[in-house]
Amino acid sequence: MPLEVTWPFPQCPRLGWRISSRVVMGMVGSYSYLWTKYFNSLMVHNQDVLLNLVDERPQDTPLITVCNHQSCMDDPHIWGVLKFRQLWNLNKMRWTPTASDICFTREFHSSFFSRGKCVPVVRGDGVYQKGMDFLLERLNQGEWIHIFPEGRVNMSGEFMRIKWGIGRLIAECSLHPIILPMWHIGMNDVLPNETPYIPRVGQRITVLVGKPFTVRHLVNALRAENTNPTEMRKTVTDYIQDEFRSLKAQAEALHHRLQNHT
């Protein structure tokens, strides 16, 4: 299924593009910062781990953050956990794969979301498509990518098997990314998955930042064994899923404790 709009990213972005992208990222980030921290109650556990990785990791070390998907505005709301100055630093902020059938259906929408470092991914087109290739290039430049590995908003709250796209990005990356799992609770109270889609105030949000890890040892072993690409993606994805799953119960316990104390 082809993308409904022209590919939004220029090969060599001009000054006007970079300035407009910085404005979009900064303004949306500022909204998220104010809305989650001041109009709602935000509790972040192990926040310094994320902040330090955004600021201080080596230039040749990509970062992949993964978290659960509760609401259609988890991104950008989740980035209320960052420092205000980070939200305005275009070079440090994340790229994220974004459903093309939602955010890239018109040229105006495409222009806005692409300047917000959202990359169109066509559902059903698999792990080999232009958006995924673009994200892989960003990783190879040492940049930060945020992924909702469930692939869609999870309204049931049950743990879903994560998609293989993340496995491809890691398996084919020429560098060795740091992977940071996170789990949040309460975003679907801030923006419920029902009409009217208007963000609410006075809600409690818990964000648990997990322990960073790499799969360098696993990828090197799979390459040494000449593992075929499909099996390699699956093995890497399964490993990440195990690390990711362990956060769910911890985050729920922290969130319930917060509710009981208020």
From Swiss-Prot:
Intramembrane segments: 19-35
Topology versus the membrane: Peripheral membrane protein
Subcellular location: Mitochondrion outer membrane; Mitochondrion inner membrane
Catalytic function, reaction form: a 1-acyl-sn-glycero-3-phosphate + a 1,2-diacyl-sn-glycero-3-phospho-(1'-sn-glycerol) = 1-acyl-sn-glycero-3-phospho-(1'-sn-glycerol) + a 1,2-diacyl-sn-glycero-3-phosphate; 1-hexadecanoyl-2-(9Z,12Z-octadecadienoyl)-sn-glycero-3-phospho-(1'-sn-glycerol) + 1-(9Z-octadecenoyl)-sn-glycero-3-phosphate = 1-(9Z)-octadecenoyl-2-(9Z,12Z)-octadecadienoyl-sn-glycero-3-phosphate + 1-hexadecanoyl-sn-glycero-3-phospho-(1'-sn-glycerol); 1'-[1,2-diacyl-sn-glycero-3-phospho],3'-[1-acyl-sn-glycero-3-phospho]-glycerol + a 1,2-diacyl-sn-glycero-3-phosphocholine = a cardiolipin + a 1-acyl-sn-glycero-3-phosphocholine; 1-hexadecanoyl-2-(9Z,12Z-octadecadienoyl)-sn-glycero-3-phosphocholine + 1-hexadecanoyl-sn-glycero-3-phosphocholine = 2-(9Z,12Z-octadecadienoyl)-sn-glycero-3-phosphocholine + 1,2-dihexadecanoyl-sn-glycero-3-phosphocholine
EC identifiers of the protein: 2.3.1.-
Span of the annotated motif HXXXXD motif: 69-74
UniProtKB keywords: Acyltransferase, Lipid metabolism, Membrane, Mitochondrion, Mitochondrion inner membrane, Mitochondrion outer membrane, Transferase
Pathway entry: Phospholipid metabolism
Effect of a null allele: Morpholino knockdown results in dose-dependent lethality, severe developmental and growth retardation, marked bradycardia and pericardial effusions, and generalized edema.
Signal peptide extent: none
One MF term in the entry's GO annotations: 1-acylglycerophosphocholine O-acyltransferase activity
This protein's record includes keyword Acyltransferase: yes
Pfam families, alphabetized: Acyltransferase
Main location: mitochondrion
InterPro entries, per database record: Plipid/glycerol_acylTrfase (IPR002123), Tafazzin (IPR000872)
Additional free-text comment from the UniProt record: The enzyme was named after a masochistic character Tafazzi, once popular on Italian television, apparently due to the difficulty encountered for its identification and characterization.
Record-stated family: Belongs to the taffazin family.
Record's protein name: Tafazzin
Organism the protein comes from: Danio rerio (Zebrafish)
